[in-house]
Design a protein with these regions (language model features):
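Glycine- and acidic-residue-biased ligand/ion/polar-headgroup-sensing regions
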Residues: 42-60
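Short acidic-glycine-tyrosine-enriched beta hairpin
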Residues: 61-80
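Double-stranded beta-helix
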Residues: 4-7, 88-123
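Short beta-strand His + acidic residue motifs that chelate non-heme Fe in jelly-roll/DSBH
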Residues: 36-37, 56-57, 79, 85-91
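Conserved short histidine dyad/triad with adjacent acidic residue
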Residues: 25-41
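Short, surface-exposed secondary-structure edge patches
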Residues: 26, 46, 67-68
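A short, N-terminal "cap"/entry segment at the start of jelly-roll beta-barrel domains
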Residues: 1-23, 36, 69, 113-123
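Short hydrophobic/aromatic-rich beta-strand segments that constitute the beta-sheet cores
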Residues: 26, 56-58, 97
Length: 123
């Protein structure tokens, strides 16, 4: 049950399943925390908010995020490959979400307890 797995997750990111062409991860963003401005050159991404509120930003250039939209439970976000994007928790409770990458974006079994852990691995 992805809804339950998302809401029960307390890690910044955990890869629950990794196939040859897609990957499912769950994430938890603390109040004021963001995913971090990023771009996946060859990976499409689908995100669904299960709990919490925030803002999604997207654009073709990281200095021009010309799309901004408020998000909440039930919001689905589609990020085309090559698009700069960020998701920010603007609420007072943790934001819980799941994301599907195609193709996979993280090694099988990835667990990042915190955003800092994710950034260490990425750099």
């Amino acid at each position: 049950n992805i809804h339950h797995a998302s809401r029960e997750n307390n890690t910044f990111r955990t890869a629950l399943w990794t196939g040859r062409h897609v990957q499912l991860t769950v994430m938890s963003l603390q109040p004021g925390e963001d995913i971090g401005l990023e771009r996946h050159p060859h990976t499409d991404q689908f995100l669904r908010i299960e709990q919490g509120v925030g803002v999604v930003q997207m654009g073709e250039d990281k200095s021009n995020l010309n799309f901004q939209h408020y998000v909440g439970p039930g919001t689905a976000i589609l990020v085309p490959a090559g698009t700069w994007h960020n998701l920010i928790n603007t609420g007072s409770t943790p934001m819980k979400l799941y994301t599907i990458y195609g193709p996979p974006n993280h090694p099988h079994g990835t667990v990042h307890q915190t955003k800092a852990d994710a950034e260490k691995e990425h750099n």
